[in-house]
């Protein structure tokens, strides 16, 4: 009798777990399919830190973003948060990844601008 009850509990649990797993998989697949792929509206850079967060870490604005400003803020914050001065490696790594993320974002935007300018130049009016 106990053997039959134990087998029944195991099969019922496996059935419930199987249904929950398939439902979770369906939801994850639907969520993945509905997310936008890349483009200028992407919120994360190639490095993984969202661009907005990287701007906040380095205290920069999107309007005055340049490699020189990124390098200036990075050098200052990396030095201030050095382990030799009693600060943490964690903060230094956040500053580094923010700088890396913003540089990759600038490279991406430059490439996008160049391809856009190149395609507009080719599609211009032709004179014969």
Curated annotation (Swiss-Prot):
Q: What's any one GO cellular component for it?
A: PAM complex, Tim23 associated import motor
- Which GO terms of type biological process are on file? protein import into mitochondrial matrix
Instruction: State the source organism's domain of life.
Output: Eukaryota
Against Pfam families, the record matches this protein to: Pam16
Q: Which InterPro entries match?
A: J_dom_sf, Tim16
UniProt keywords (A-Z) are: Membrane, Mitochondrion, Mitochondrion inner membrane, Protein transport, Translocation, Transport
Specify where the region named J-like lies, as residue ranges.
53-107
GO MF annotation, one: protein domain specific binding
Subcellular location, principal? mitochondrion
* Topology in the lipid bilayer: Peripheral membrane protein
Which subcellular locations apply to this protein? Mitochondrion inner membrane
The job of this chain, per UniProt, is described as: Essential component of the PAM complex, a complex required for the translocation of transit peptide-containing proteins from the inner membrane into the mitochondrial matrix in an ATP-dependent manner. In the complex, it is required to regulate activity of mtHSP70 (SSC1) via its interaction with PAM18/TIM14. May act by positioning PAM18/TIM14 in juxtaposition to mtHSP70 at the translocon to maximize ATPase stimulation.
Family, per the entry? Belongs to the TIM16/PAM16 family.
Q: What is known of its domains?
A: The J-like region, although related to the J domain does not stimulate ATPase activity of mtHSP70. It nevertheless mediates the heterodimerization with the J domain of PAM18 and is therefore essential for PAM complex function.
Q: How does it assemble?
A: Heterodimer with PAM18. Component of the PAM complex, at least composed of mtHsp70, MGE1, TIM44, PAM16, PAM17 and PAM18.
Name of the protein in its database record: Mitochondrial import inner membrane translocase subunit TIM16
Q: Which organism is it from?
A: Debaryomyces hansenii (strain ATCC 36239 / CBS 767 / BCRC 21394 / JCM 1990 / NBRC 0083 / IGC 2968) (Yeast)
């Amino acid at each position: 009798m106990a053997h039959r009850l134990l087998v029944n509990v195991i099969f019922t649990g496996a059935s419930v777990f199987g249904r929950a797993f398939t439902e979770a998989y369906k939801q994850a697949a639907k969520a993945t399919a509905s997310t936008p792929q890349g483009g200028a509206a992407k919120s994360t850079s190639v490095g993984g830190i969202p661009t907005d967060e990287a701007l906040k870490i380095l205290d920069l604005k999107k309007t005055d973003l340049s490699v020189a400003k990124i390098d200036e803020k990075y050098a200052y914050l990396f030095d201030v948060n050095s382990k030799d001065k009693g600060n943490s490696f964690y903060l230094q790594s956040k500053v580094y990844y923010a700088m890396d993320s913003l540089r990759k974002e600038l490279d991406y935007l430059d490439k996008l601008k160049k391809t856009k300018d190149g395609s507009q130049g080719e599609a211009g009016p032709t004179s014969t």
